[in-house]
Amino acid sequence: MLDNSRARSIVHLLILLKAHVITQIIKNTQEFTSLCTFVKVTLKATDGLTSAASKSQTDWALGENPTSRIKKLITELETSSDRIRLGEEPNLTIQLPQGDPKQRLRRKLEVFLARAKYTEELVRQAQGDVGGRCNEAKAELEEAVTGRKGPDLETQATAAAAALHNKARGTACKVAGATTDTNFAGTSLVADLMCLCAAETNSREKHICGFESHASGVWANAGTNSNAGEIWGKILDACKNREIQVEVTPQFLRIAITKFEGLLGAQAHKLTSNGNAGAWLLGYSMNAGSVTCDGQSSTNGICVDYKGSSDARGPIAWLGHIKNAITALENRDKNLQRVRKLQRQAEAILMSAEDALIEANISLGGKDMVPASEVTVPNSSNPTSRQNSVVQEPTTVSAAAITPLILPWTLLI
């Protein structure tokens, strides 16, 4: 049996070991997850904000657009003798008026056709706006990741990481007085993730973000042997494998921004030692009074320093791109709502055209409908185009009058 002294020593050792493990786990894991969230949103947007995806969101609910369906009604009206098939229902036909009443009915349908065409043109314009805003949001998200404009996200991201090759880490991971050649903090998510997660040596802080990042190389403070592009590949793989459920929506991105901003200064110790020096640190530091974020020790900081030339937060370019993406997504959503509203208006015009045919049938005494198979209805794919005439609006049919003729597709409106 162990004596009390040895037992206490073992317990104490286990406590210290557990504390060490916890410290290793918590250091920059939350910060990595926060920035990784924006990267994963961007990767999802690469597939979800394409032209095909935006088109699928604005297709006609009933398949064929109302203009085409009204054209078919006009074609059948002109080519049928006394009965016409209504809509796409094979067993529904109605009797047609003859002579002048038939011509007046045709002119009514042409007025509805003109209205449908105008409304559908507005639909097409709004659909184009949806696609444009999708492309804009996608481009902003990709530039947030890479700090560069370009069609290939992963190639641009690797190039952004390679730009850190041989750069002094203590300078590159600061934003104060940012210049293209030396200061990279805040310019891209790639740069900030490198500052948070790249090991400084093969043995120092190699699990700082919760995964081993040094297998493909290290990023020393002097910038030598950094292999930045390979380290980024390791970080990107870890991000892709991180179980984070993301959405490409304004609401989700706003929440992600709030979480990111809540981490600023969260791990900067001794904030009172030098005013507000550690308030804008992202990542781990034991000494906010003289932070270098050079990765050489926990005291110096394995972090990103967003402090500007004064104690205020400096510019974070990638965050600006995320906010621009939010605006683009909000405009996309507004245009989606406009598309759907206009589509409902166009479909209502189609219903009015069909109601005009029903009204004509009722005016003839509401003859019983007969199966279409008993009526020869020519099928023309080239409807005659005519100039629209100015006519009076069709009279609205009372609900009581059309109740016996409830059409299956009207239940979809």
From Swiss-Prot:
Its placement in the membrane is given as:
Lipid-anchor; GPI-anchor
Q: Where in the cell is it found?
A: Cell membrane
Propeptide at 380-413
Query: Which residues does the annotation flag as glycosylated?
Result: N91, N361, N379
Q: Mainly localized where?
A: membrane
The cross-references to InterPro entries, in alphabetical order and at most eight, read: Trypano_VSG_B_N_dom
Query: Would I find Cell membrane among this entry's keywords?
Result: yes
GO CC terms, sorted: plasma membrane; side of membrane
Give residues with lipid attachment (GPI-anchor amidated asparagine): N379
UniProt superkingdom:
Eukaryota
Q: Which residues form the signal peptide?
A: 1-22
| Keywords tagged on the record | Cell membrane, Glycoprotein, GPI-anchor, Lipoprotein, Membrane, Signal, Trypanosomiasis
Query: What function is annotated for this protein?
Result: VSG forms a coat on the surface of the parasite. The trypanosome evades the immune response of the host by expressing a series of antigenically distinct VSGs from an estimated 1000 VSG genes.
Q: What is this protein called?
A: Variant surface glycoprotein YnAT 1.3
